[in-house]
């Protein structure tokens, strides 16, 4: 019988605890994919956890459905914690600690400004991209046709160039809200544009040619052999100038925070390599642990993934696999190949997570109770699951993603075709 999340918080915790007891016939804890198809435990497909205000739509099918509402916005574009969230206000960090990485910065004034989220292409034609190695956080998610796309969040570090910049998706109604960030992107489909226009991000936290924000905030760099849509670039510094003009270039006041620790937490199991097969041979994210640097090195489909600005391979202190409900909507993104429908990735409520750090993986769950809360991470018993101080890459995956289990320290995650 499929395991399903229940409707209230206590029952949800009970369900997660039950699922944590289910294991592979190998060493990988089944909560690696509390919802996923595990080869030894059978298919476990929970429904998404409801928020306090509505029930999420069912797991995605290939039949488009009307889009579900995003979590209720705050009253204004300025994030404000709800009374319920007030009890969760974290102990303030020292003013020189980056809340998105847990690292101290040399100049604390770099944190007295707004984070900037930028949409970056992952089409093979644009690789290597520019600027991803400088981001605090990078989210990778399905766009359509199996191709993935990135939303990179920059805070203290401002690379000189980021791109190529591409169009936004429904997930970009969520990520800028989580991190109180200005969002820079090239535009969007008509349906996504309307969702953005009616969100609490608009207009102050939105920067796109779609809404009349062109040069000097975005600029073209024509490159031989590259299509026009792959030539748009920007950088966080110039977008912050726009934020300054709008009066929003301020240090965020986050109502909840992630937990960081240099000490390796308990409960991990060894793994020195894993991959996520979004689109095998094209968008396969591969991560190998380097014990000398104590970081995960990223490759794409067998080729080291480098930053065009430095020529260096992209690395991460943490790689976080966030499993969430993926729902096709009635928003059409394009018409090629018979057409593709926009995917709503429901990163609200809570769901399963696997955190890779220090050559180990740690299963647990993620939580986001309010719209302007960032994702936070916990063991099955509700104890905070700390990240390693440093940058993080977040791989967003459907609930019914399959896993190979651990074989010789390696794991393969295979999401359904989308």
Where do the protein language model's features map onto the residues?
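A surface/extracellular/periplasmic glyco- and lipid-processing/surface-interacting theme
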Residues: 80, 87-135, 144-418
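Compositionally biased, intrinsically disordered low-complexity segments enriched in Pro/Arg/Gln/His
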Residues: 2-6
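Ser/Thr-rich, Proline-interspersed low-complexity disordered segments
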Residues: 41-96, 107-108
């Amino acid at each position: 019988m499929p395991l399903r999340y229940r409707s209230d918080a206590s029952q949800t915790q009970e369900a997660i605890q039950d699922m944590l007891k289910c294991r592979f016939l190998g060493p990988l804890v089944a909560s690696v994919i509390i919802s996923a198809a595990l080869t030894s435990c059978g298919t476990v497909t929970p429904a998404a956890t409801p928020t306090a205000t509505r029930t999420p739509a069912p797991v995605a099918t290939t039949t488009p459905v009307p889009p579900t509402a995003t979590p209720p916005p705050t009253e204004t574009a300025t994030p404000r914690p709800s009374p319920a969230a007030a009890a969760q206000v974290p102990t303030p960090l020292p003013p020189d600690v980056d809340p998105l990485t847990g690292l101290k910065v040399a100049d604390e004034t770099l944190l007295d400004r707004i984070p900037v989220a930028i949409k970056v292409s992952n089409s093979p034609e644009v690789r290597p991209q520019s600027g991803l190695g400088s981001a605090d956080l990078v989210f990778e998610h399905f766009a359509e046709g199996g191709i993935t796309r990135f939303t990179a969040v920059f805070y203290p570090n401002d690379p000189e160039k980021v791109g190529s910049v591409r169009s936004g998706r429904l997930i970009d109604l969520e990520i800028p809200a989580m991190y109180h960030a200005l969002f820079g992107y090239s535009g969007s489909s008509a349906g996504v544009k309307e969702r953005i226009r009616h969100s609490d991000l608009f207009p102050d936290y939105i920067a796109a040619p779609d809404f009349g924000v062109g040069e000097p905030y975005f600029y073209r760099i024509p490159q031989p052999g590259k299509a026009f849509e792959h030539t748009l670039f920007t950088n966080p510094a110039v977008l912050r100038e726009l934020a300054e003009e709008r009066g929003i270039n301020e240090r965020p006041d986050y109502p909840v925070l992630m937990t960081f620790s240099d000490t390796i937490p308990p409960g991990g199991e060894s793994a020195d390599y894993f991959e996520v097969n979004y689109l095998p041979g094209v968008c396969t994210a591969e991560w190998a642990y380097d014990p000398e640097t104590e970081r995960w090195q990223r490759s794409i489909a067998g080729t080291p993934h480098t930053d065009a600005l430095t020529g260096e391979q992209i690395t991460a202190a943490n790689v976080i696999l966030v499993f969430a409900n993926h729902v096709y909507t009635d928003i059409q993104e394009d018409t090629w190949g018979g057409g593709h429908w926009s995917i709503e990735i429901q990163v609200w409520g809570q769901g399963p997570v696997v955190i890779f750090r220090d050559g180990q993986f740690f299963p647990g769950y993620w939580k986001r109770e309010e719209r302007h809360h960032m994702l936070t991470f916990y063991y099955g018993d509700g104890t905070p699951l700390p990240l390693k101080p440093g940058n993080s890459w977040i791989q967003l995956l459907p609930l019914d993603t399959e896993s190979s289990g651990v074989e010789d320290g390696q794991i393969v995650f295979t999401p359904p075709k989308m």
